[in-house]
Amino acid sequence: MVVVTEEIVNGLKETLTDVSQPIAKRFRSLFTLRNLNGPLCIDAMASALNDKSALLRHEIAYCLGQMEDEYALKVLIDLVKNSDEHPMVRHEAAEALGAIGSESAHKTLKEYSNDPVREVSETCQLALSRVEWYEKNKPETEEDKMYMSVDPAPPLKKGSVSRDELRSKFLDSNLDIFNRYRALFSLRDIGDEQSVLALCDGLKDQSSALLRHEVAFVLGQLQHRVAIDPLTTCVLDESENAMVRHEAAEALGAIASTETIPLLEKLLQDKEPIVSESCAVALDVTEYFNNTESFQYADGIKILLEKNLVDQQQK
């Protein structure tokens, strides 16, 4: 067990905020701070929210939500309210407020559920529905959960709906976003090839970029090779929302098939920074999953110790 000290947090913060470092290395420090948890780590993460990388800022917001700590509420509320911020970052901050589930975020979520930016308004609606659902229902136990992520909507009760019915609900553009998400996560939890193919159909859904981006994220969690071609088509589509292409790129990295490496390397030159940076992170993840010597992806402390050793040797 790692004792969280100011020295460790400051070292990770230094890497996180160092614009000269590769984006993938900065992400590793971010994930390490998320895993260590606590106010010191939240402050360190928040200190990088003025970075020019929208991808990094959005990932910080995501991590703050996954920590489920009310200490991060003010930072997240400010992000949602900032109309000059990138929509992807505002969306992630709103989703994080839903993940934390505090009543003090209700006012902001309700106010911005009519935001002119659709990704923001839909996420606020989704987050409100999540908070209201958990006010009336017991959360899943850790034993019941198949994935450790704090999801923006709970799956439906296991066995209560057939796979075909779930697919129908998931693809029904007339259904509200919360219930479509519930069907999405139910398909994820089934996790067989037919469910993965049903999810891949969602990448072609034109009713919601928010839904498509969540599909890509979930396909990364599932790591099923049958999703490689649909994800490849998605990330290559320059007309697609950058938020969706980003998730598709990182999903390909999570699947960690060496056949996707040339594609990801090519897209390092993509004109959309969110996509090119996502491909750099995806390649780092692919390398990790294909390197049996690696133990933990969020290895910021290991990197920090190695840096300190080098510094000492140079003195």
UniProtKB/Swiss-Prot annotation:
Disulfide bonds: none annotated. Fe cation 1 binds at H58, H246, E247. It is an enzyme of class 1 (oxidoreductase). Binds 2 Fe(2+) ions per subunit. Catalyzes the hydroxylation of the N(6)-(4-aminobutyl)-L-lysine intermediate produced by deoxyhypusine synthase/DHPS on a critical lysine of the eukaryotic translation initiation factor 5A/eIF-5A. This is the second step of the post-translational modification of that lysine into an unusual amino acid residue named hypusine. Hypusination is unique to mature eIF-5A factor and is essential for its function. HEAT-like PBS-type repeats lie at residues 23-52, 56-82, 89-115, 179-205, 211-237, 244-270. One of its GO terms (molecular function) is oxidoreductase activity. Its EC number is 1.14.99.29. It comes from Dictyostelium discoideum (Social amoeba). InterPro entries: ARM-like, ARM-type_fold, Deoxyhypusine_hydroxylase, PBS_lyase_HEAT. Keywords: Hypusine biosynthesis, Iron, Metal-binding, Monooxygenase, Oxidoreductase, Repeat. Its cofactor is Fe(2+). Pfam families: HEAT_2. This is Deoxyhypusine hydroxylase. It catalyses: [eIF5A protein]-deoxyhypusine + AH2 + O2 = [eIF5A protein]-hypusine + A + H2O. PANTHER family: DEOXYHYPUSINE HYDROXYLASE, PBS LYASE HEAT-LIKE PROTEIN. Belongs to the deoxyhypusine hydroxylase family. It comes from the Eukaryota. GO terms for biological process: peptidyl-lysine modification to peptidyl-hypusine. Fe cation 2 binds at H91, E92, H213. Pathway: Protein modification; eIF5A hypusination.
